[in-house]
């Protein structure tokens, strides 16, 4: 017969409670065991430091201390169904679509002027040469920001409506794929950070397209080489990730674990060094574009 609602059950009936439990038990168990897994990880780091003795002022010693400092105060105290948030943060396909649109839109940005014979006229004008190129770089950044914002918002709204974002105010490490992240932000803050990271990566790729367009006098080789450049960036992947703009488009992969590299015996977080190195790449690309001998 029909079950009578009872306030002692979360869903008012024992049957519905059992259904909810079956759906969420793995995630509930994972979150309940999170504190124990961190305790084991910190214990391992402490054992390493004790074993090193006086050698703690080395890369490995400092790295183990970084592990203790990063994970020292972490704990999960509440439970949310974060399946939708996890799926959204792993979705990167729209970034590839934006790159293809950038390739189509940016390839002729300078080469088309050479094809139509406008380059000499612009070069002889009062605001030609560097000012014109600087304006084109700014237009490329705005063009990139517009398309990136459109796709970011569409993805965000779709997942927010279809999957629902429960517990987005929780710490990022409460998500199963980010349980060992070195970042200390909330999920909402990370979403904004990921948007900025992807936009920076797209700007870097767009500058490569502008550089190619400044070299060639026709658009089709720019388009062909630009396509090959995207494929190259996707192929080299992790091997050159510090100077690979695609690493910013797959920012979630970089943020999921505590990854470091040795910098004069000090552990530097990859997630910190990555945006700095891409900003340096952007600066170098801008200088190359402005100083290239084929520019106007």
Task: Specify the residue positions occupied by each region the protein language model found.
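Central hydrophobic cores of alpha-helical transmembrane segments
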Residues: 220-233, 249-251
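Secretory targeting signals
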Residues: 31, 37, 41-113, 134-215, ...
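Transmembrane helix-loop junctions in multipass membrane proteins, especially transporters and channels
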Residues: 156-168, 218, 238, 242, ...
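Short helix-to-coil transition segments within interhelical loops
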Residues: 123-129
């Amino acid at each position: 017969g029909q079950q009578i609602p009872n306030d002692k059950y979360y869903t008012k009936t024992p049957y519905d409670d059992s259904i909810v439990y079956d759906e969420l038990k793995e995630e509930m168990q994972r979150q309940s065991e999170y504190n124990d897994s961190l305790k084991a990880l910190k214990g391992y780091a402490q054992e390493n430091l004790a074993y090193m003795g006086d050698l703690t002022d080395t890369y490995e010693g400092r790295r183990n201390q970084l592990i203790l400092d990063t994970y020292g105060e972490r704990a999960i105290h509440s439970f949310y169904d974060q399946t939708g948030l996890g799926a959204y943060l792993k979705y990167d396909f729209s970034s590839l679509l934006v790159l293809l649109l950038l390739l189509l839109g940016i390839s002729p940005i300078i080469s088309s002027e050479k094809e139509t014979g406008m380059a000499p006229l612009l070069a002889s004008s009062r605001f030609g040469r560097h000012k014109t190129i600087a304006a084109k770089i700014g237009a490329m950044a705005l063009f990139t920001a517009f398309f990136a914002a459109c796709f970011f918002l569409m993805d965000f709204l779709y997942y927010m409506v279809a999957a629902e974002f429960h517990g987005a105010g929780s710490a990022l490490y409460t998500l199963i794929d980010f349980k060992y992240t070195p970042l200390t932000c909330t999920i909402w803050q990370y979403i904004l950070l990921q948007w900025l990271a992807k936009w920076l990566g797209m700007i870097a790729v767009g500058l490569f397209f502008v550089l190619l367009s400044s070299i060639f006098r026709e658009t089709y080789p720019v388009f062909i080489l630009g396509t090959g450049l995207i494929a190259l960036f996707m192929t080299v992947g992790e091997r050159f990730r510090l100077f690979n703009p695609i690493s910013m488009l797959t920012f979630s992969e970089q943020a999921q674990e505590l990854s470091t590299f040795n910098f004069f015996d000090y552990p530097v977080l990859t997630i910190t060094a990555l945006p700095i190195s891409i900003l340096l790449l952007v600066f170098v690309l801008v200088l190359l574009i402005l100083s290239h001998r084929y520019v106007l």
